[in-house]
From Swiss-Prot:
This is 6-aminohexanoate-oligomer endohydrolase. Heterotetramer composed of 4 alpha/beta heterodimers. Belongs to the peptidase S58 family. Expressed as an inactive precursor that is cleaved autocatalytically at Asn266/Thr267 to generate an active enzyme composed of an alpha subunit and a beta subunit. One of its GO terms (biological process) is nylon catabolic process. The keyword Metal-binding does not apply. The active site is at T267 (nucleophile). It catalyses: [N-(6-aminohexanoyl)]n + H2O = [N-(6-aminohexanoyl)]n-x + [N-(6-aminohexanoyl)]x. Keywords: Hydrolase, Nylon degradation. Pathway: Xenobiotic degradation; nylon-6 oligomer degradation. Optimum pH is 7.0-8.5. The gene is nylC. The keyword Hydrolase applies.
Length: 355
């Protein structure tokens, strides 16, 4: 775990000047040519760098359309895995939401991008040679971000792009940064002129036999925070070179009796995958625990202007040892400890997305 500060300097107004270099999204167009205007060809997303992870039975693929740019990222678990879904905020974009999945599809394109998940479903049916027995049904749940504000087209992830992301899926690799569903993700949308591009991020932790993989596409109203309290992405003032916590903008607006400004069209979508067996109650609480923890790295989070979804997935491969007194009612201390560790892995993933 890297806890090194990102050279943060707090000024008296609450702004935080930081390094990395700014990556402004620019004012939105909210329109432009759509899918039919282009001869769209899915591209395998490579991103800024590749995370290598050791999680047998889990593959990840990312694809995008350069013309968007927008994309889709698929987490494929051929054997299937139990899933809990935690969705919060005012504008959730979700399909499926099943408690057992063979794939999770994350995509751009707002509600239109849910079509990518249908492409994943169709491709999995083809792999079954169109067998449709109930026990063989391939389940896919999808979540989307609203990424039109960071680009000038109406291109969205369609069935072909979802299918391509699945075809590109390989074990043990995840493209970090501007790739897949994170191609046009952005953060810090108090004002469009201060919005910055993010991306998709992942982090992996192995502790003995325990494996945890976190995947996230942060596209929030809020800014991205590091563990030292520095703002590493979002709400960047190009004139002053300062990234500023939105709370100071809101405080000033209320003090001057003005309506606070916040832009609509925001979502953070994520998945936390482990091999630890949990009861349904524990898995649901695990999802809530990790999702709630993300407010440390994204501030504000779960707002009325956001639509945040987290998928908690377990492959049910190992049981953690129990100790006397480790259970209280239906909840286990083991699941609580796992959630605490997974929360740190997810924060690492958020920071990777912001690099």
């Amino acid at each position: 775990m890297n806890t090194t500060p990102v050279h943060a300097l707090t000024d008296i107004d609450g702004g935080i000047a930081v390094d990395p270099a700014p990556r402004l999204a620019g004012p939105p167009v909210f329109g432009g040519p759509g899918n039919a205007a282009f001869d769209l060809v899915p591209v395998r997303s490579t991103g800024r760098e590749t995370l290598r992870f050791d999680f047998p039975g889990v593959s990840v693929g990312s694809a995008h359309y350069e013309e968007g740019p927008t994309g889709a990222t698929v987490i494929h678990i051929p054997a299937g895995a139990r899933t809990a879904v935690d969705a919060r905020g005012g504008a959730v974009g979700l399909s499926g939401g099943y408690d057992f999945n063979h794939a999770i599809c994350l995509a751009g394109g707002a509600s239109y991008g849910l079509e990518a998940g249908a492409g994943v479903s169709g491709a999995l049916l083809e792999r079954l040679e169109y067998r449709t027995g109930f026990a063989e049904a391939q389940l896919v749940s999808s979540a989307v971000i609203y990424d039109f504000s960071a680009r000038s087209t109406a291109v969205y992830p369609d069935k072909a792009l979802g299918r391509a992301a699945l075809e590109f899926a390989v074990p043990g690799e995840f493209p970090q940064g501007r790739a897949g569903a994170g191609m046009s993700a952005s953060a810090g949308k108090v004002d469009w002129d201060r919005t910055e591009i993010t991306g998709q991020g992942a982090a992996f932790r192995r502790l003995g036999d325990v494996r945890i993989l976190a995947v996230v596409v942060p596209n929030p109203v809020g800014v991205i925070m590091d563990r030292a309290g520095g703002i590493v992405r979002g709400n960047y003032d190009a004139q002053t070179g300062v990234r500023r916590h939105p709370v100071f903008d809101y405080q000033e607006a209320f003090a001057e009796q003005l309506p606070p400004v916040t832009q609509a069209g925001n979502t953070t979508i994520s998945a936390i995958v482990t091999n630890v067996r949990m009861s349904p109650v524990e898995l649901n609480q695990f999802a809530k625990q990790v999702h709630s923890s993300m407010h440390r790295g994204i501030q504000p989070f779960h707002t009325d202007m956001d639509g945040d979804t987290l998928f908690a997935v377990t492959t049910d491969e190992i049981d953690l040892p129990t100790t006397p007194g480790s259970s209280r009612g239906r909840l286990s201390v083991n699941a609580t400890a796992l959630g605490a560790i997974a929360s740190e892995v997810m924060w690492d993933a958020v920071l990777e997305a912001a690099k």
